[in-house]
Amino acid sequence: MTEYTEIHRPQFHFTSKRKWINDPNGLVYFNGVWHLFFQHNIEANTWGPMWWGHAVSSDLLHWEQKDHALHPDKMGSMFSGSAVVDHNNTSGLGENAIILFYTAANRDDSQASYTQCMAYSLDNGVSWEKYANNPVVRTMAVSYTHLT
């Protein structure tokens, strides 16, 4: 059913071609294609710097893995988020933009910071552009685990 032939690889549950994946994010349907995004450590089979992988399917069973949609940057790794199709160009980014909302997690400094960011595609998910004015929501001064 899929392109995978390894004996222990799931055939009805998406898995990446290589390395470690975390939770799926932002399943969205657009122009007859399902777009699945997932947290992906491209360096190892364990937890590490998170990218957002991207796979597409017409039937939710047969998946084709695409180039990564998001990669770590100065704001940190790419954590959980969602996707929407902006049919009415409410964002002003362009007609029928696919928009990704994600958490940028900077865990390298002495105080971890988590911000909400956006990225978008104007070519049916082939290429992705991070929003120039990221973050769209900054970390609050008070978190649930400690005061900052």
Language model: regions and residue ranges:
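Conserved Ser/Thr-centered positions that define the repeating blades of beta-propeller domains
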Residues: 57, 119-122
